[in-house]
């Protein structure tokens, strides 16, 4: 009888003789637990250094939702900050949308992270910022367009929270899977402005608060494995109001594509990095919202329009898009968003916002003609 083979040795290249127990999704390397963790951390450190994401002395807000991405992001940022002496002042920033049975539970996980990591935590709520909770909004308008409201409000809330604590940069838990899905969604929507920049590791440089994505090249499966290997506690439940979010369809497509072509995720990201837009595509001029002071290309920002609609009962205000002119233009709130609510990893990328606003086939084809790959 043939003897059963044990696991292969660790392939870290560091001389480790431990048996390999983890296959890294990103490159297929077979590693032991400790070497996998170190390899994962080295990948993030390389992305930070190569892209010069931070400067010594910066106060960095970490978007924290309590989910796996933001939990791993906070842990790795603290680990690398200590190990490599980045000299960063790290602080956790959470947004309470007011969703009972979901956000209140996830914030308990964030509180545990605060205690364990020893990082300051600031929580801002939709109720305090906008006078509405998501439970209130869904009760008024139903679930059809609720992701649009949440996406706009959450992104602005993160910016306001970061400014409140004096942060010079906001980091979010977008991972490689998120980036590939967002790229695909923007192609399907024909969203030229976002398509050109949705895979950037730093966005928002044209405004006051840049956003960085240190986990950009980390696969979701590796993030889950890292959390388990390091026994990190995080919140598992998905948002109860977004069971049919647009991103879900893109995610399934990317997963199916990955089964056939394992490098599909990285290839999609690399393709996005090479996208450029023709000069004749008109981009908006950013200015300040007359009501709240947030960036917009209109007199009022999208958040203020949505709030006005809720307060006056005209809930289509700010939700329905007007007919496009022949010249392709993009509203500033669309330019600023990176693919939804920015909740991916507690700060970026759910992509549910605007699911019902996907472009008609003919308009999509016309817009894609303006792209250069």
UniProtKB/Swiss-Prot annotation:
Keyword Cytoplasm set for record: yes
Known function: Plays a central role in 2-thiolation of mcm(5)S(2)U at tRNA wobble positions of tRNA(Lys), tRNA(Glu) and tRNA(Gln). Directly binds tRNAs and probably acts by catalyzing adenylation of tRNAs, an intermediate required for 2-thiolation. It is unclear whether it acts as a sulfurtransferase that transfers sulfur from thiocarboxylated URM1 onto the uridine of tRNAs at wobble position.
Stored Pfam families: ATP_bind_3 (PF01171), zn-ribbon_14 (PF16503)
Coiled-coil ranges (or none): none
Reported consequences of knocking out the gene: Required for normal germline maturation and for viability. Viable at 20 degrees Celsius. At a higher temperature (25 degrees Celsius), the hatched eggs progress through the L1-L4 larval stages with kinetics similar to those of wild type but present an important delay in germline maturation. Whereas gravid wild-type worms are present 53 hours after hatching, germline maturation are still ongoing in the mutant after 66 hours, and the first adults containing eggs are observed 75 hours after hatching, when a large number of new L1 are already present in the wild type.
InterPro entries: CTU1-like_ATP-bd, CTU1_C, Ncs6/Tuc1/Ctu1, Rossmann-like_a/b/a_fold, TilS/TtcA_N, tRNA_thiolation_TtcA_Ctu1
GO BP term, example: embryonic morphogenesis
Gene Ontology molecular-function annotations: nucleotidyltransferase activity; sulfurtransferase activity; tRNA binding
Domain of life: Eukaryota
Subcellular location: Cytoplasm
Organism annotation: Caenorhabditis elegans
Cellular component annotations (GO), alphabetically ordered: cytosol; cytosolic tRNA wobble base thiouridylase complex
Name of the protein described by the UniProt record: Cytoplasmic tRNA 2-thiolation protein 1
Known pathway: tRNA modification; 5-methoxycarbonylmethyl-2-thiouridine-tRNA biosynthesis
């Amino acid at each position: 009888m043939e003897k059963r083979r044990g696991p292969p040795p660790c392939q870290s290249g560091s001389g480790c003789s431990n048996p390999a127990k983890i296959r890294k999704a990103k490159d297929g390397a077979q590693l032991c637990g400790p070497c996998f963790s170190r390899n994962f951390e080295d990948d993030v450190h390389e992305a930070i250094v190569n892209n010069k994401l931070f400067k010594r002395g910066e106060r960095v807000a970490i978007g924290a939702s309590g989910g796996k991405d933001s939990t791993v992001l906070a842990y790795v940022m603290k680990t690398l900050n200590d190990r490599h002496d980045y000299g960063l002042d790290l602080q956790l920033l959470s947004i309470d949308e007011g969703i009972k049975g979901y956000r209140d539970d996830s914030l308990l996980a964030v509180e545990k992270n605060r205690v364990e990591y020893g990082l300051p935590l600031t929580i801002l709520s939709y109720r305090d910022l906008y006078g509405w909770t998501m439970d209130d909004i869904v009760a008024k308008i139903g679930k059809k367009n609720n992701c649009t409201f949440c996406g706009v409000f959450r992104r602005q809330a993160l910016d306001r929270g970061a400014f409140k604590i004096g942060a010079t940069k906001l980091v979010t838990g977008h991972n490689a899977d998120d980036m590939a899905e967002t790229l695909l969604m923007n192609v399907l929507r024909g969203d030229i402005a976002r398509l050109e920049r949705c895979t950037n590791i730093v966005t928002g440089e044209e405004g006051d608060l840049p956003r960085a994505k240190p986990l950009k090249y980390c696969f979701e499966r590796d993030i889950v494995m890292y959390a388990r290997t390091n026994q990190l506690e995080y919140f598992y439940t998905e948002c109860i109001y977004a069971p049919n979010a647009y991103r879900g369809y893109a995610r399934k497509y990317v997963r199916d594509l990955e089964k056939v072509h394992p490098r599909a995720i990285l290839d999609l990201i690399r393709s996005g990095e090479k996208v450029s837009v023709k000069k004749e595509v008109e981009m908006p001029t950013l200015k300040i919202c007359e009501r709240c002071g947030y960036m917009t290309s209109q007199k009022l920002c999208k958040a203020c329009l949505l709030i006005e609609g809720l307060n006056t009962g005209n809930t289509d205000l700010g939700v329905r898009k007007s007919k496009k002119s022949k010249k392709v233009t993009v509203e500033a709130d669309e330019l600023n968003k990176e693919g939804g609510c920015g909740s991916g990893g507690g700060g970026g990328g759910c992509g549910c916002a605007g699911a019902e606003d996907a472009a008609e086939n003919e308009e999509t084809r016309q817009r894609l003609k303006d792209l250069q790959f």
